[in-house]
């Protein structure tokens, strides 16, 4: 793409990010404002105008999935050479390269978990701990190491920070355990994940030759989710830069929810002090959520006592349904009520995987899983065998690899379908339970093929290999039950935020003002996961007999409307789609209303021709967004949520014709 085409796909603020091709630059990006789009286009634009060599760019993300997504987007924009990795992935790659020269021999194995070493260390000290305590102590070891606090300074540090020592230990015991843990690790000849960063920092600091090679390779840096950076990661970034300032950081102070792991927003808010002359760009246009949801998010944030570096969102969506507020008698009633509302949504055409139930702790999920199961609604359960480790998936990829080696020719989607038809895929899902999981696994691969830009089967297999390397699995098929922490970075059409009572949100152990502010930010993160529908709920007691009386969360004081009684507003939920369309008709222009009606008529004809429900062509929300945006070309059409490459290929011509006011005829008998 040429530079002008790249900029045409961005809003003014995103364009300001993209055209600032040299750092230092701080991007304060609110939820749903397109930060990933802005920074990937910045790299692509810099390459297009010759300001940067993509092979000298390192984009740092916080999850493997985010790194995969960024690499995929950059490849689509014609920039396949830019590196996108997590801190640990980038550091491990460099450490493996330099270790034989600097230290000698191969890099020690990296232990995937600390549990066995922590348990052995505690036993050596005569400290009795159970499985839960092992997990908590392992987390404390990680916190100390990323905070660069050694055993000698641990007790003073936790006292200064008013940090609770886990597992009922005193600070002295925990300090001794830190020492013994390091000894046990060294005796086994292994390293942990924190050591990857620690050892690389040591190399870069002590070996000028190593630092010179790394800095020559990477001259421009982009760091996403910068509000979640800890001291060790900030130190590594400084050493990568080596006094240079060509760095772009992106983050949202309001989404700082990992301070208990050592993360701090201070690196984002203090970026200008560290890099004098740094430019700051705010992304405030929210393309994800309706105005009603964005208003609630802004209200939550407005009550925070720490707002430095936060932004106020402005929804770019048309009016939607009102946020729902439900009060229930007890936990069982809450789970049943939420399940009833979800059943209504599913009956109305919303796919289960587009719905989430978010909660503060994992322990809250069982009641909702049972209530949804009672109604026959599939649930996405955490855990289970990894997708790429499943036998049928491994067989499918082996078949595809063999077909690619044989250089079979044809349209990619047809080739993949043909190969996978021999291992359980068919155009229609099996009616019974038998074979349904295998079919779902195969269909996920077919879906990837449909969305792929690969020209050949070999190129598609290479994409699958990259997914395997990054462990990027398909989206789960059922209603997502997730903690708010796990939901960060994700979004759904409909979100139910449950258990909003004192002791849960804010959590009972959030005793300091700083900890309670982090609970408020958790609420903000949860609210901003919703695109179209959001319902908040809490229960007055734990059990039906009234035991375990509760109070509604203080975080909702001044926000929760006057009590609406007990139970789920089922009628209101059933009317949610009508409410969205009614709000659109009240607020949109006459031209947009007319275009929306013509788009719906066209969609109905297309769905009948294809034998699929209308929402499988485009959702009402996507049609509303088209009607308001009135895109003039495929580039502008592609920006609209819900329109990927496959739908652009299939429907761009008739949709753009309808936008131009032309008549489009669909032969429903074809």
Predicted regions located by residue number:
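P-loop NTPase Walker
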Residues: 1-104, 108-109, 212, 295-298, ...
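Accessory DNA-binding and partner-docking regions appended to nucleic-acid-acting proteins
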Residues: 537-670
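Conserved RecA-like helicase ATPase core segment
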Residues: 2, 6, 45, 231-328
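Conserved helicase C-terminal RecA-like lobe
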Residues: 163, 167, 351, 365-377, ...
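Inter-lobe coupling/hinge region of RecA-like P-loop helicase motors
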Residues: 3-10, 15-19, 23-31, 55, ...
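Conserved RecA-like ASCE P-loop NTPase motor core of nucleic-acid helicases/translocases
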Residues: 52-63, 82, 224, 250, ...
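ATP-hydrolysis module of ASCE/P-loop NTPase motor domains
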Residues: 101-194, 218, 280-282, 286, ...
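Conserved helicase NTPase motor core
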Residues: 8-19, 23-31, 38, 58-59, ...
């Amino acid at each position: 793409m040429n530079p002008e085409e790249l900029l045409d796909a961005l809003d003014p603020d995103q364009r300001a990010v993209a055209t600032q091709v040299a750092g230092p630059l701080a991007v304060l990006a609110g939820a749903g404002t397109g930060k990933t789009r802005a920074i990937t286009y910045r790299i692509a634009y810099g390459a297009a105008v010759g300001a940067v060599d993509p092979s000298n760019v390192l984009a740092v993300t916080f999850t493997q999935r985010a790194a995969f997504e960024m690499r995929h987007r950059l490849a689509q924009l014609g920039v396949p050479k830019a590196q996108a990795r997590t801190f640990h992935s980038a550091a491990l790659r460099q450490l493996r390269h330099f270790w034989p020269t600097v230290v000698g021999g191969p890099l020690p194995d990296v232990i995937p978990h600390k549990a066995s070493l922590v348990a052995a260390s505690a036993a050596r000290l005569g400290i009795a701990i159970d499985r839960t305590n092992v997990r908590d102590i392992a987390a404390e070891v990680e916190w100390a190491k990323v905070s660069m606090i050694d055993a000698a300074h641990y007790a003073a540090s936790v006292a200064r920070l008013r940090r609770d020592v886990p597992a009922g230990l005193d600070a002295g015991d925990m300090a001794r355990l830190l020492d013994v843990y390091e000894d046990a690790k060294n005796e086994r000849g292994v390293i942990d994940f924190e050591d990857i960063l620690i050892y690389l920092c040591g190399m870069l600091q002590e070996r000028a030759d190593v630092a010179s090679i790394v800095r020559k390779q990477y001259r421009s840096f982009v760091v996403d989710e910068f509000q979640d950076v800890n001291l060790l990661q900030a130190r590594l970034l400084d050493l990568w830069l080596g006094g240079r300032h060509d760095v772009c950081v992106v983050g949202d102070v309001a989404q700082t929810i990992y301070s208990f792991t050592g993360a701090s927003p201070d690196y984002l808010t203090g970026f200008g002090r560290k890099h004098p002359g740094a430019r700051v760009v705010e992304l405030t246009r929210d393309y994800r959520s309706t105005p009603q949801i964005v208003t609630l998010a802004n209200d939550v944030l407005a009550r925070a006592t720490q707002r430095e570096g936060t932004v106020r969102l402005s929804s770019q969506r048309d009016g939607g349904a009102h946020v729902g507020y439900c009060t229930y008698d007890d936990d069982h009633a809450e789970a049943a009520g939420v399940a009833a509302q979800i059943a209504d949504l599913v009956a109305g055409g919303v796919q289960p995987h587009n719905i989430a139930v978010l909660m503060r702790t994992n322990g809250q999920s069982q009641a909702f899983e049972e209530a949804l199961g009672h109604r026959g609604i599939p649930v996405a359960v955490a855990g289970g065998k990894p997708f790429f480790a499943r036998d049928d998936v491994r067989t499918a990829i082996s078949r595809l690899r063999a077909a690619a080696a044989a250089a079979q020719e044809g349209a990619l989607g047809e080739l993949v379908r043909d190969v996978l038809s021999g291992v359980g895929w068919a155009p229609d899902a099996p009616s019974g339970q038998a074979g349904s999981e295998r079919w779902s696994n195969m269909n996920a691969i077919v879906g990837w093929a449909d969305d792929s830009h690969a020209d050949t089967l070999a190129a598609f297999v290479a994409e699958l290999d990259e997914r395997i390397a990054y462990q990027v699995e398909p989206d789960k098929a059922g209603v997502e039950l997730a903690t708010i922490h796990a939901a960060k970075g994700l979004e759904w059409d409909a979100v139910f935020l449950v258990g909003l009572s004192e002791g849960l949100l804010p959590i009972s152990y959030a005793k300091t003002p700083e900890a309670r502010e982090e609970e408020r930010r958790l609420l903000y993160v949860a609210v901003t996961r919703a695109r179209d529908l959001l319902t908040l709920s809490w229960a007055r007691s734990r059990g039906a007999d009234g035991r375990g009386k509760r109070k509604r969360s203080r975080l909702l004081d001044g926000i929760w409307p006057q009590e609406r009684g007990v139970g789920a507003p089922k009628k209101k939920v059933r009317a949610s789609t009508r409410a969205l369309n009614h709000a659109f008709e009240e607020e949109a222009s006459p031209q947009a209303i007319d275009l929306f009606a013509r788009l719906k008529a066209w969609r109905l004809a297309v769905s009948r021709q294809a034998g699929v429900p209308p929402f499988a062509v485009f959702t009402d929300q996507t049609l509303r967004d088209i009607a308001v945006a009135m895109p003039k070309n495929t580039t502008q059409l592609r920006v609209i949520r819900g329109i990927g490459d496959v739908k652009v290929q299939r429907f761009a011509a008739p949709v753009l014709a309808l936008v131009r006011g032309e008549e489009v005829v669909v032969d429903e008998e074809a």
